[in-house]
């Protein structure tokens, strides 16, 4: 894990972007997960160029800020998986929004219609090859088609709130690193994350 403190001014994110650009070409990891980095289209592009220099292309997973940068730069299709909640999915679905703050209201109000948002995100090339959409019912999507849904066990306090998506993304990355294909890894991660929530009660 590579960590850098950032209080919102972007200093830590820029330090981490720079570190990634310098070290990724020599990295031999099989999975790369990008999470809470301040979105920066220029730095995002530099990181992708560094990844291209790696000996073996890793599985690329993005959540939160880095997912935003991927969409904003028109590079969403370079990623193997995004892990959005419904609010983040609404941003991916809005082909005109340059930043989540500008997601159009009528799209935000469709947040209970995940399938429509998924279709729209893929139609405008703003989605990764796979999506693991977090919500009351998690949806696993491959190339625009929902291939699995996970809704049990249900722990309402865990549904798409801060922190639960982090554990889900971590489980997905660990399973991919262990050699699982992405779709079964996403299904298993969604189920395991829900079980963790139920057991933690």
Predicted regions mapped to residue ranges:
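Conserved phosphate/ATP/ADP-binding segment of small-molecule kinases
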Residues: 70-147
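Short, acidic/turn-prone active-site loops that include or flank metal/cofactor-
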Residues: 4-8, 86-88, 153-156
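Short, contiguous, well-ordered secondary-structure segments
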Residues: 143-145, 149-151, 171, 175-176
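Charged C-terminal helix
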Residues: 194-201
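Ribokinase/PfkB-type carbohydrate-kinase core domain
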Residues: 3-78
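Short, small-residue alpha-helix embedded
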Residues: 91, 161-191
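Short pre-catalytic strand/loop immediately N-terminal to key active-site residues, enriched for Gly-Thr
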Residues: 151-163
